[in-house]
């Protein structure tokens, strides 16, 4: 069964989100987010056997594309909704993007996180203006509490991915990519809940249906892959790509992906680590595991992309420095460039 057969038809996917929605979002957020560069990597192209173009979304103020969708949603609020404030459940880039732009616009932002959230993530969100509430042991607990507070306090819930306004904002990444490099053959996009690839696939379908859109998930969290393929696959584990470690993908985004995305690939942890390391060594840019997923997929499936002009989204750069150091050391060891001597 193909992806297109698994869910809705292409027509239904087009109706769910349109290029007009994405263009409107682009006009709305213009000047408030960075129009990030799209650059050709000669060295990575030589390594991968295809022409690689990189979209540096890790250069946003919050180091991730997520602020695009968050801002688009914020700009749709009524004056009463702005006064009351917004709420979200997130321990990642969505919390920072929503907090930063909400605070900038004078909208109170509450973020619910599990009690197990690392202190550094709490501090990062608070540093850009968000009020953090710690509740529950898991994300599901935090999500349930956020929806409860939404009702009790009259707040507006901003979903990190399963929202047309958010997906339209994320789609502006694809709009910029195809304005900057119009003749790409393929776009390779990380998938967590599916907001980013839904927006990008909508743009690609409208501007050039011949462009192939390929999603990437971590092998440990193949939630969208399993849903689209109709398979029962376990999700869980300690992945470097925690930004796309989503157990339950969006309903809205699933319909769009089913209709417009050509393929979904899975990548393992070693491939993710190698991609993070390569981007730092060659492009001198820091990406998180999710941000390196596209490159990991291209390097893991060389025949799939051979000779093509491929656009990759470096979707985020928020990675703990100690984790990054360990990733680099492990990758050096795998390459035989690191040795340990024991003197007795």
Which positions does each model-derived feature cover?
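PLP-dependent amino-acid enzyme catalytic core
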Residues: 1-344
